[in-house]
């Protein structure tokens, strides 16, 4: 197996990153249930197994990377044999917070530690830059991303229905950086 390397993205990576298959298949969804009571609203998420795997359209425009990559504080590319196989894009937010807006791994390289490597690079970048917290946003149907967040100690911290252009629910996970 090829050794995976993580480094800052360079211009030559962009065509391969934008052309990557960004879609994911999921067997579960976090289903939102809102219950209104006299003095409160209770939001509960239940993990529900779907009758069959569903394909998920990536909620962001992959081609926007060409315009945004120089404006982002950091974008990391994962490589195998000098070929881009994944990337992670970060944004700064007020209050010493960093936000992972894109985390994509080529289908042939999924479940091989690539996303974990990218996330570790983002966390190291956040610590070096003095960020206190790192946030991840994921679609409520993206079970692989939810599992990744949980595996790395990220805690569920909120949601926004109709967050994406696809009108999907976004789940937010965060962890403190040390």
Model-derived segments and spans:
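Extreme N-terminal starter segment of soluble prokaryotic enzymes
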Residues: 2-5
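Acetyl-CoA-dependent GNAT
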Residues: 11, 19-97, 101, 106-108, ...
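Active-site acidic-Proline motif in GNAT/NAT acetyltransferases
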Residues: 106-112, 140-141
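Conserved short alpha-helix immediately C-terminal to the canonical SAM/SAH-binding motif I
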Residues: 118, 142-145
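Conserved GNAT acetyl-CoA-binding A-motif
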Residues: 126-137
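C-terminal "cap" of GNAT-fold acetyltransferases
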Residues: 139-143, 151-152, 161-178
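A secondary-structure capping/hinge motif
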Residues: 156-158
């Amino acid at each position: 197996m090829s050794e995976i390397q993580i480094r800052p993205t360079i211009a030559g990576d962009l065509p391969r990153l934008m052309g990557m298959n960004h879609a994911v298949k999921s067997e579960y969804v976090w289903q939102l249930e809102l219950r209104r009571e006299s003095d409160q609203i209770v939001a509960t998420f239940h993990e529900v197994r779907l009758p069959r795997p569903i394909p998920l359209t990536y909620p962001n425009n992959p081609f926007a990377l060409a315009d945004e990559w120089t404006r982002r504080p950091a974008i990391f590319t994962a490589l195998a044999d000098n070929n881009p196989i994944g990337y992670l894009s970060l944004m700064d937010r007020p209050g010493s917070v960093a936000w992972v807006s894109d985390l994509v791994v080529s289908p042939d390289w999924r479940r091989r530690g690539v996303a974990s490597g990218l996330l570790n690079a983002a966390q190291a970048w956040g610590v070096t830059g003095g960020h206190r917290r790192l946030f991840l946003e994921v679609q409520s149907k993206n079970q692989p991303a939810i599992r990744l967040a949980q595996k790395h100690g990220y805690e569920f911290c909120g949601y926004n229905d109709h967050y994406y252009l696809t009108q999907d629910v976004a789940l937010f996970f965060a962890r403190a950086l040390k």
